[in-house]
């Protein structure tokens, strides 16, 4: 089986394909998630404090998601077995998120406009990788699109700008990604 999740894991049985195809599809899906979130965060890091500020809210949401999954874990004695989560070590994930929030808050102090330091590609790709890893480990890959909606909007603005410009020669936004459009 393969699991697709939004708020709760939903098994997707690939009986005709067997276990090997399920593993291959999972690996492709995981690589797609990590690549997408890393690049989305990297695109968002073009404005002082934007990637760090948005990431604080994303990791805050994942702190609550992981803690809720700890409370509703299948290993808890008086939990409804039909509505429990089988996430491995959710409390550790919540602590990891809280540590990232603290680190980003300290970083944001020096990165707010006018920025004295910046995280660069290494920092933004690491933040995107952390979002991807958390979404995979908590089995909330599709919910991550809602939680990190600003990252998705930035990527979509760049894709729309490039696609429309190649097709018509006209720009939809004065500048892409979206946060640079609002600067002008």
Task: Tell what function each PLM region has.
Residues 1, 23-184:
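Alpha-helical transmembrane segments
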Residues 1-19, 75-80:
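Extracytosolic (periplasmic/ER-lumenal) interhelical loops and adjacent juxtamembrane/interface segments
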